[in-house]
Amino acid sequence: MTTRERCQKAMEYHEKGLNCGQSVLAAFTDITGFTEEQSMALASGFGGGMRCGGVCGVISACVVVLGMAYPSTLENGPEGKKRSTQLVKEFQSRFLQRFHQLNCHELLAESDIEGTSIARELGVTHHCRLMVVSGVEMLCGMLEELEAL
């Protein structure tokens, strides 16, 4: 699946009423191994910054995808944990660089949010949908760099 197709899929999930985290996680079932339903169930509380304005559900879902692609387990010990930490910090850094915030409450207050190139190509204007599509595009770029896609 191309990055654009994955972004389109996440956007369609969001348009159908899924929250931001559900929309992102369900677009990566081929990487996580979760079914659509499992993805939706797992991320059902991610929307609205875990329903309290905290960390954006897009980020939470992307962290789950990274964890499934590059897990930290008892088997891989401290090295797995170190890699997991580095990947999460790298994704957060990229998100912060683009949107200047990590928390839903602050992201929703921003009036000059500009999406990534695919978000612009798809004509996304809905605030949270911009986060969904842009987050998927950023994660795909990161996974491609890591050769997981």
Where do the protein language model's features map onto the residues?
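Acidic-glycine-rich active-site phosphate/pyrophosphate-binding loop
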Residues: 1, 25-44, 105-111
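Polybasic, low-complexity association/targeting segments
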Residues: 1-14
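Short acidic alpha-helix initiation/capping motifs at coil-to-helix transition points
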Residues: 16-22
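Transmembrane alpha-helix interface/packing and boundary motifs in multi-pass membrane proteins
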Residues: 45-53
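DPxDG-like acidic metal-binding loop motif
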Residues: 61-69
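C-terminal binding/interaction regions
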Residues: 84-149
